[in-house]
Design a protein with these regions (language model features):
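Long amphipathic alpha-helices with heptad-repeat character
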Residues: 110-111, 122-139, 143
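Short linear, low-complexity motifs centered on an aromatic residue
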Residues: 101-124
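Charged, low-complexity interaction regions
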Residues: 24-25, 48-50, 71-76
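Histidine-centered active-site/metal-ligand motif
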Residues: 17, 63-66, 89-90
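Amphipathic alpha-helical packing elements
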Residues: 74-109
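Intrinsically disordered, low-structural-confidence terminal and linker regions
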Residues: 1-21
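Flexible, glycine-rich loop/tail regions that form catalytic "lids" or insertion modules at the edges
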Residues: 32-70, 81-83, 107, 125
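Charge-rich, solvent-exposed alpha-helical interaction surfaces
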Residues: 11-18, 39, 43, 125-128
């Protein structure tokens, strides 16, 4: 079965224009400015969840990266509202979702480096993983009021 393009480039352009943000169909890198993240958050966050703008911006960038890296799995075609809804859904699971994801991805990268016997990458990934775990632990402690 040929999977159709459910979200057209024209629709993404139209929405970007309506939101008064840059044209996300022209993105070469998964970067989102805080101003654009704020616009998207204001559209998708109907229940007024307490979501940190920096975290939302990072979530948008992660989801855009996934779509740009795995083009055959880019379900939103970089549509800002749909991408924002994916981020929102993840935050409904856990406000630390992207911090948890960073730890999981680095653990996977570390395993690959160990399997290849690449000492330099092992050291690099281990340090980044330790930093990501600290960031996650600090966020969790803040969330529980410690």
């Amino acid at each position: 079965m040929k999977v159709p393009q459910y979200v057209t480039v024209e629709e993404v352009k139209r929405v970007c224009k309506e939101l008064k943000i840059s044209d996300w169909t022209k993105k070469k890198a998964p970067k989102v400015s805080p101003r654009e993240a704020k616009v998207v958050l204001s559209v998708v966050n109907k229940e007024k969840m307490k979501i940190d703008l920096k975290d939302f911006c990072e979530g948008l960038q992660v989801e855009l990266e996934h779509g740009m890296t795995f083009k055959d799995a880019n379900v939103t075609n970089n549509h800002p509202v749909l991408t924002g809804l994916i981020v929102l859904a993840h935050f409904k699971e856990s406000l630390d979702y992207y911090k948890l994801l960073e730890v999981a991805e680095l653990e996977g990268d570390l395993v690959k480096a160990v399997a290849r016997g690449n000492a330099e990458k092992i050291k690099n990934y281990y340090k980044r993983l330790a930093d990501a775990r600290i960031t996650l632990n600090q966020a969790e402690l803040k969330r529980i009021g410690k």
